[in-house]
Amino acid sequence: AFLAQVCAEFCALLPQLRLQVDLSDDDNLILESGHDLILHEGECDVPGLIARPVGCNRIGLIASPAYLASNPLPVNEQALHEHSWLMYKHPALDRHYWAFWREGERVRIEHPIPRILSDNYDFLLANALAGVGLLIAPLWSVQPYLDAGQLVRVMPEYQLDPDAFGDQILAVYPSHRRATRKVHAFIEFLSDFLQDRGDGVAVPAAWNAD
């Protein structure tokens, strides 16, 4: 929903523009296929790429109102293992614990047994919207659903460590091609979009010198 909304608004702003959007976790895709830009969470150490921060990767625990209404158990640290969980499977993530920050103290919580385990985030998000269970999600990716009341944050006083994904959203492009005006425009648009939602970072003034 997040990327679809960004692209729809950007295309409305520039009607003559054509976009090709591919969804992949492979950072090498941009080097191998000639893509102009990729969006990446966390550090990017792939040789030959330039990375620009465009947003903050804040993580939250979310659920649908329907799930919360059908489950009388409280959503707190003591009852987490009794809930239905939707869990994202990724080789970069810790398979045993989540790390939370609570009042400046780092807390580790052992993973519960998931009701659904998947390597596809969109599939898990669809199940969260359908009321199947709790989901740990990047807040920028679920903000439209939070705004619409389709999802709500639970345990908001707990800050989740973004783990191996890092605390920034990066716009990444090949150094040998530099960035075209279209790529510049999209990065600035994306940064403004995220800033409007409280998850953006200002594009540096030096950006225009590239």
Regions found by a protein language model. Give the residues of each.
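Residues that form or flank phosphate/diphosphate-binding pockets in enzymes
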Residues: A1-F2, N71, R95, R181
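C-terminal effector-binding regulatory domain of bacterial HTH transcription factors
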Residues: A148, Y158-D210
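Central regulatory/effector-binding core of bacterial HTH transcription factors
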Residues: A1-P47, V203-D210
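Acidic, Gly/Pro-rich loop/turn segments at junctions of secondary structure
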Residues: D22-S118
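Hydrophobic hinge/microswitch elements
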Residues: R108-R153, Y158, P162, A171-Y173, ...
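A generic structural signal for alpha->beta connector loops
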Residues: Q16-R18, G48, E82, A148-L151
